[in-house]
Amino acid sequence: MPCCDPYPWIGLNVGRLSSFPLLKYPQVRRWLAPFIVACSLYFLLWIPEDQPSWVSALVKCQPILCLVLFLWAVAPGGSYTWLLQGALTCSAVGDACLIWPEAFFYGMAVFSVAHLLYLWAFGLSPLQPGLLLCTTLASLTYYSFLLLHLEPNMVLPVAAYGLILNTMLWRGLVLGRSAGWGAVLFIFSDGVLAWDTFVYTLPFARLVTMSTYYAAQLLLTLSALRSPGLKTH
């Protein structure tokens, strides 16, 4: 009988712990449990998007807030961890804003701050301008189609957000490992959301967007544990 996967968001089961060494630490598994439960609650409840409320906002934000708690409990201190906590907190606020269509601009602004904090954490060394050229060409190809479908008042904010997001992707890829994969999933999630919102309604768009978004935030969070020195309790 196949083994039940207790950590579906990172593709891990108890028979494959060696594929993600960090999960060998009991405190990592213990403090990831609230995130797994919160994600499961979001997808099980699946509150309709046309019924915005503070309850739906809380359910949507809970997994991200659990990651803030995870970093506080497990990650070593330092500017990298603090910047990630700030980025996650901004992301949770952005998630809440996006529940209400009239708060879309506020949500985009707060997510821009989150990406800037991720960018600050990742740093600018080594530079690797060739990688920046590749990500920029890919982003320009996507946004050249997307911007054609936007209202005039949306063009500048979306273009600015795309620039920040592309820069975060570049630095995440330079850092590599879970930060790189997290950045890729984040830009994929945002790309699906934007296309579904502004261009063409996609099947299962919300499921794809939210599953990749939560996975992206988890991977970005785990990048804080890339160096030894987990907290002990």
Swiss-Prot record:
Q: How does it sit in the membrane?
A: Multi-pass membrane protein
Query: Would I find Hydrolase among this entry's keywords?
Result: yes
* Localization (cell): Endoplasmic reticulum membrane; Cytoplasm
Which GO terms of type biological process are on file?
Answer: ether lipid metabolic process
Kindly list the GO molecular function terms attached to this UniProt entry. Answer: alkenylglycerophosphocholine hydrolase activity; D-lysine 5,6-aminomutase activity; identical protein binding
Gene Ontology CC: cytoplasm; endoplasmic reticulum membrane; membrane
Catalysed transformations (reactions): a 1-O-(1Z-alkenyl)-sn-glycero-3-phosphocholine + H2O = a 2,3-saturated aldehyde + sn-glycerol 3-phosphocholine; a 1-O-(1Z-alkenyl)-sn-glycero-3-phosphoethanolamine + H2O = a 2,3-saturated aldehyde + sn-glycero-3-phosphoethanolamine
Q: Its biological function? A: Catalyzes the hydrolysis of the vinyl ether bond of choline or ethanolamine lysoplasmalogens, forming fatty aldehyde and glycerophosphocholine or glycerophosphoethanolamine, respectively and is specific for the sn-2-deacylated (lyso) form of plasmalogen.
On subunit structure and binding partners, the annotation says:
Homodimer.
In Swiss-Prot or TrEMBL terms, this protein is called Lysoplasmalogenase TMEM86B
Q: Which organism is it from?
A: Rattus norvegicus
